[in-house]
Curated annotation (Swiss-Prot):
Residue runs in coiled coils: none
Pfam families referenced in this protein's UniProt entry, alphabetically: NADHdh
Protein name in UniProt: NADH-quinone oxidoreductase subunit H 2
Keyword Protein transport in annotation: no
Protein source organism: Nitrosococcus oceani (strain ATCC 19707 / BCRC 17464 / JCM 30415 / NCIMB 11848 / C-107)
Location(s) in or outside the cell: Cell inner membrane
Alphabetical keyword list: Cell inner membrane, Cell membrane, Membrane, NAD, Quinone, Translocase, Transmembrane, Transmembrane helix, Ubiquinone
Length: 344
């Protein structure tokens, strides 16, 4: 296809096309996820939600994007200008980089590396640097306090999340995401959610805490510290933080589907319904499972009040981490005993 180009471009262009094919849909999904969030929470609270721009409000995300693009990026006089502008980039770059190893189907992945799970844990943890930098560079006590809260929270829940994913690693016998999904073949009852149920719950709740979403959004608690680490941000600089948060939400949901719910595998494998749904592409099953987890994100926001900071820390260190360690021992024993059908 690119034979007429220099050899260096023949390698680079296909990779760039694949990156665009992942990043562009992600940005579009984020745009309409914000619309879905406002509508769903509106219905839960007996309201209509946005309904003015376009038919039934479906063009509201476009209006929001135009508004953010036209707004001025105001830099406080006492802020560190370079670091202030660098922080949003440092927040969104890791959130996008992680998607390089996410498989959407058996052979639909940008980089099929064997240490994909390790890569996700390493790169995913780097987004906290953007948050810390934003809090420090803003030269605001509210921003700095929000950044410190966020850093402590992310580090705390990353341990529990990492231990939960180690359980999947033991069960699947691989760090490759595709191989972990293939290890769950056999239908709904063969997926890892059943033997790893406590780790499944802890992973998802830790994911909600890591993305600073309600009820764990003390890092940007409006009633306590105005708006947290991005209190001084406006325009597209603010939009990048916003984009990073929602991309991480989608990432946590997609990983939950891959690690615990069989990824792109049909839930009807091994049943009489398997032949009926055989025509459904694997990526559709993955999108449905991801959408279910995203709905839980929105449901939590509409349902639960914000936890106190000390309650969040206690939950992470004194409840989640001990449970994950105990269950890892249980999973290790089940693996040694080759308990079927998950650990054979």
């Amino acid at each position: 296809m690119f034979d007429f180009l220099p050899s260096s471009l023949q390698v680079t262009l296909p990779i760039l096309f694949k990156i665009v094919a992942i990043v562009l849909p992600l940005i579009l999904i984020v745009a309409w996820l914000t619309f879905a969030e406002r509508k769903i929470i509106g219905y839960m609270q007996g309201r209509i939600g946005p309904n003015r721009v376009g038919p039934r409000g479906w063009l509201q995300p476009i209006a929001d994007t135009v508004k953010l693009l036209l707004k001025e990026i105001i830099i406080p006089a006492s802020a560190n200008r370079i670091l202030f502008l660098l922080a949003p980039v440092l927040a969104i770059a890791p959130a996008l980089a992680v998607w390089a190893v996410i498989p959407f189907d058996a052979h639909l992945v940008l980089a099929d590396i064997n240490a994909a799970l390790l890569y996700i844990l390493a790169i995913g943890s780097m987004s906290v640097y953007g948050i810390i930098l934003a809090g420090w560079a803003s030269n605001s006590k509210y921003a700095f306090l929000g950044a410190m809260r966020s850093a402590a929270q992310v580090v705390s829940y990353e341990i529990a999340m990492g231990f939960a994913l180690v359980g999947v690693l033991i069960a699947g016998g691989s760090l490759n995401l595709g191989e972990i999904v293939q290890a769950q073949e056999g239908g709904f009852w063969h997926w890892f959610w059943l033997p790893l149920f406590p780790l499944f719950l802890i992973y998802f709740i830790s994911g909600v805490a890591e993305t600073n979403r309600l009820p764990f959004d003390v890092a940007e608690g409006e009633s306590e510290i105005v708006a947290g680490f991005h209190v001084e941000y406006s325009g597209m600089a603010f939009a990048l933080f916003f984009l990073a948060e929602y991309i991480e939400m989608i990432l946590v949901s997609t990983l939950a589907a891959l690690m615990f719910l069989g990824g792109w595998l049909s839930p009807f494998q091994g049943t009489v319904l398997e032949a009926i749904f055989e025509w459904v592409p694997g990526i559709v099953w993955l999108l449905i499972k991801t959408a279910i987890f995203l709905f839980f994100y929105l449901w939590f926001r509409a349902t639960f009040p914000r936890y106190r900071y000390d309650q969040i820390m206690r939950l992470g260190w004194k409840v989640f981490i001990p449970i994950t360690i105990v269950w890892l021992l249980v999973v290790g024993g089940a693996r040694v005993a080759q308990l079927g059908p998950w650990f054979t």
